[in-house]
Amino acid sequence: MKYKSANICLAMTGASGIQYALRLLQCLVDAGENVYVIISQPAQIVIDMETDLQLPSRPNDMQQYLTDYLNAKEGQIQVFGKDQWTAPVASGSGAPNAMVVCPCTTGTLSSIACGSSNNLMERAADVVLKERKKLILVPREMPFSEIHLEHMLKLARMGAVIMPPNPGFYYRPKTIEDIIDFVVARILDHLDIKHELLPQWGIDNNS
């Protein structure tokens, strides 16, 4: 099976904070990006708990649902199952330029740090690291244990960007959406995707 080329892979795990991932996907679609998407089964449970979405369980149905929900073009979002080893993200020759794991469980963090490739999500992260592409991990856990911190340090030394979803309040957010946008804006900055979610610090965009 042939797939459309995409520059970004977005993986969602079963950590709380799935709104960050859904908002990020919306922004990537709005920016015209093609996106590979991997959603773990625990992430599907979290989506059901934290949102009103009725996400189907089959990857093809999930892909159509997200395409319709986010008003994306056909083929702009491509969803892969955890055992879909023919997906481009499973090989260095088809690796995207960047991958974001958002939110990222500490279990997934551990597997990536140790080079495990037990499913497509872990393999995709392994490929991105070995190909020297950009890997952004958004670990949603509190507090972090020594093991968590050791894994983060190990991954940071490999070149991964560790980005806990810690919002800033100096711009005085008024809604939950404002807080979500702060985190998503920082992810987009590291993906070199232009956005208007937040003003740039110290820059007058009206001048």
Residues covered by each model-derived region:
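A cross-family phosphate/adenosyl-ligand binding-site feature
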Residues: 1-135, 143-207
